[in-house]
Amino acid sequence: MGFRGVFILLSVSMITMYSCVLGRDTAKSGISEINFGSGGGVTGRVVMYRLRPNGTVYNDNNELVTKLTKKETAHLFGKLSKYADYSYDNPSNMSCFIVITSKRKENRIVWAVMGDPHIDSEVVELYERFMSKIDTK
């Protein structure tokens, strides 16, 4: 099973597991959560973090990793709300992804880790901004 298969399986599992605990949509953005992650390569390992509207960040084991400030959370939710319908699916051996979930749909944005010239640069900047807030030790 390739990265795409693992990613789809992981996404479906996460949605199923957390569907009962999803909070209300953020009033301004309409987004209920944002997942940021990367994976692939020889091992196929996928690392994912889930950002909730209250700023809490959980890893894929549902362990609390950190809590972002209200300002940072509002910035990420606000900026990423305009990408709720952005279509980009270009995985490679190693890929990054953002999954934007709202009441009405889920949108996956997937791009190559090693510089994808066609992805909207703001998406990559927002991904990097979020990941810089995570203590990955």
Regions of interest found by a model, annotated:
Residues V46-M48, V65, R108-I109:
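Well-ordered beta-strand positions in beta-sheet-rich domains
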Residues V57-S87:
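A short-motif feature that recognizes glycine-rich, charge-decorated loops
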Residues M1-C20:
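Sec-dependent bacterial lipoprotein signal peptides
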Residues G37-N59:
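N-terminal secretory signal peptides
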Residues C20-G39, K71-E72, Y83-K137:
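Short, well-ordered, aromatic-rich surface patches in folded extracellular/luminal domains
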Residues G55-N62, K105-W111:
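Short, well-ordered strand-loop elements centered on a beta-strand within folded domains, enriched
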